[in-house]
Amino acid sequence: KQDSYEIAGVKEENQKEEKKMGFLQCFGYKQTWAFAIGKFMTDGVWWFFLFWTPSYLNTQFGIKTSEGLGMALIFTLYAITMLSIYGGKIPTIIINKTGLNPYAARMRAMLIFAFFPLVVLLAQPLGTFSPWFPVILIGIGGAAHQSWSANIFSTVGDMFPRTAIASITGIGGMAGGIGSMILQKVAGNLFVYASGTTMIDGKEVEMTKELLEQGAQFVHPA
């Protein structure tokens, strides 16, 4: 029976012999594109929550994050997102219970996490009762997103040798950053456009001072 230090020495020697994968060579694998597209399509959701939630609270409820209630709401939001730390443990639980390999267990965990952000769809209707409801729901969505994101990062180690992990992770991070930038820009333009238009008899028209006053009469009747 070999001693542990001898086995470790063999592994270390084998790792040294691994040929490093070139940066451009990484793009020749479909797994790279799968990871990059996954980051491109999803990273913007996290930054959307972080960037627009304070504006949402101010616009919908008149709550500023510089005030006590605003600080409490934002603190609650971030505290809930910390649940994502536990999300990294779910694949291990699945492996222990089902015997699946790590990659398959991560895929199953990511499928579970993907459903949780749907609760954010209830933020707007429940917001009519209290600002705490949307904050809690957005926090749950953010926590699920970060759990999903942590697991997609881990899949890189499942699919590629150690010498390629840094390059593949960097490619995915770049794709996620570009996707996030595009989403925030599009969202901002959409908000500006929506605030300047309205619907009358099913037709889109430009918002005017008179229409704003008419709408205010319904919201705040005399």
What is the role of each PLM region?
Residues 16-20, 33-37, 72, 108, ...:
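Alpha-helical membrane-protein architecture signal
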Residues 24-89, 125, 141-157, 180-188, ...:
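Extracytoplasmic gate region of multi-pass secondary transporters
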Residues 96-97, 156-165:
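Paired intracellular helix-loop junctions of major facilitator superfamily
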Residues 103-151:
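C-terminal transmembrane helical hairpin of 12-TM major facilitator-type secondary transporters
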Residues 72-76, 137-138, 168, 172:
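Hydrophobic positions within alpha-helical transmembrane segments
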Residues 66-67, 162-171:
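Loop-to-transmembrane helix entry/capping segments in MFS-fold secondary transporters
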